[in-house]
Amino acid sequence: MIKQALISVSDKTGIVDFAKALSALGVKLLSTGGTAKLLADAGLPVTEVADYTGFPEMLDGRVKTLHPKVHGGILARRDLPEHMQALEAHGIPTIDLLVVNLYPFVQTIAKDDCTLADAIENIDIGGPTMLRSAAKNHRDVTVVVDPADYAVVLDEMKANGNTLGYKTNFRLATKVFAHTAQYDGAITNYLTSLGDDLQHGSRSAYPATLNLAFDKVQDLRYGENPHQSAAFYRDVATPAGALANYRQLQGKELSYNNIADSDAAWECVKTFDAPACVIIKHANPCGVAVGADAGEAYAKAFQTDPTSAFGGIIAFNREVDEAAAQAVAKQFVEVLIAPSFSDAAKQVFAAKQNVRLLEIALGEGHNAFDLKRVGGGLLVQSLDSKNVQPRELRVVTKRHPTPKEMDDLLFAWRVAKYVKSNAIVFCGNGMTLGVGAGQMSRVDSARIASIKAQNAGLTLAGSAVASDAFFPFRDGLDVVVAAGATCVIQPGGSVRDDEVIAAADEHNIAMVVTGVRHFRH
């Protein structure tokens, strides 16, 4: 039974109401510093830990709760007579509920003007020590580190005479160990990122020791293939607008491949300002378009490759209305993603319960790093978030692109970044016309892209082409021009750039270079 609680929190969200409810249940309250003052100001009967232990806070608050009367009351096993006799001999009451959260270390180091001294002062010592003590003794002590658990704890206490069941205590304890591990990981990441000058402003983005923290969202039926097991984890610091923030409105459970393809679709569609639609198959765009609204964008995107769109993942950057929903519902779709769905659109899909509908709020955030496992190691790089602006382009041919061609080139370049290398993308009038992806030679990607357009009955006359990396020879350029392209955008940087540019002039097409490569593997 919970008779006495110790409360010491940095995040004071909801703590006064929680403490009031505990007091109403007859629980004695112990507290420290600012938390004790807050509770006392709210009219609650609270005992300062310094008065409880008979030992004052010292060293500017560095030593407050590191005392046998605190830790003895937390760590004593109630089922061991010798433990209880020791408490009685030393006049130590049990502490049955511990409510603690930690100094805001992560928030402190996120500030531009943070110093090493600031960071060090925000490394909590007493808090993690109490948390780990209580979590270790979770059989007898309830420990709460997350304000979101206050209501759960109160409800169970009220229902069971101030007592919580073992499963609840165990769950709360595992949450504590995860929290303290993440806290220590953040400290290690920061301290090992500092250079020889130990200056906050010159720290490395890649610490000497890298700790990553993810929380499991769900187990998956299987992995990329049925014989592989899998689970989906969410970054503890999930950025705004990220796929992991999805809310599923209907449909079957997401699979491993659903999630991977949905991420590719969502990241691509977010980059467009105009209403856009992206159709993904095996992590590659098979149709991308912008339009006056979601319905028009979908109709154009679907034209690119209706065959590959079968069973695809579709993402919109605008609300899906009834008209767009009716158009999409005519096809077999695995997952549909949008910032929102109108009520009428939801009714359309209610008749297709296997279609997974995901709502994700649009946001500018993205992952800080891109991670790739290799045998025995991990590759870590910054995200490829570079979007080339018109002023950064350099025309290298005698003929300059027309304004329309420039619009098509920028659209094509934006799509090419999300196509597996080697990537060749034909575009025109705000839509993809042919996509060549994942080939070992660039010329083969060019041929495949033109064949795709032919199969879809789309003309490439006057089209724009984007290549994710430079043309190593003129052969790839010759293929796209023969197919009908009149302008090309590519990074440049080949030892044969002069030969490729000369070929472009020979064909009287416009070519611009970005100086930026977009390999995607």
UniProtKB/Swiss-Prot annotation:
Domain MGS-like, first and last residues per copy: 1-145
Gene Ontology cellular component terms for the protein in this record: cytosol
GO-annotated molecular function: IMP cyclohydrolase activity; phosphoribosylaminoimidazolecarboxamide formyltransferase activity
Source taxon at top rank: Bacteria
Enzyme Commission no: 2.1.2.3, 3.5.4.10
PROSITE patterns: MGS (PS51855)
Pathway participation: Purine metabolism; IMP biosynthesis via de novo pathway; 5-formamido-1-(5-phospho-D-ribosyl)imidazole-4-carboxamide from 5-amino-1-(5-phospho-D-ribosyl)imidazole-4-carboxamide (10-formyl THF route): step 1/1; Purine metabolism; IMP biosynthesis via de novo pathway; IMP from 5-formamido-1-(5-phospho-D-ribosyl)imidazole-4-carboxamide: step 1/1
Keywords of the record: Hydrolase, Multifunctional enzyme, Purine biosynthesis, Transferase
PANTHER family for the chain: BIFUNCTIONAL PURINE BIOSYNTHESIS PROTEIN ATIC, BIFUNCTIONAL PURINE BIOSYNTHESIS PROTEIN PURH
Protein name: Bifunctional purine biosynthesis protein PurH
Organism: Burkholderia mallei (strain ATCC 23344)
Lineage: Bacteria, Pseudomonadati, Pseudomonadota, Betaproteobacteria, Burkholderiales
Gene from which the chain derives: purH
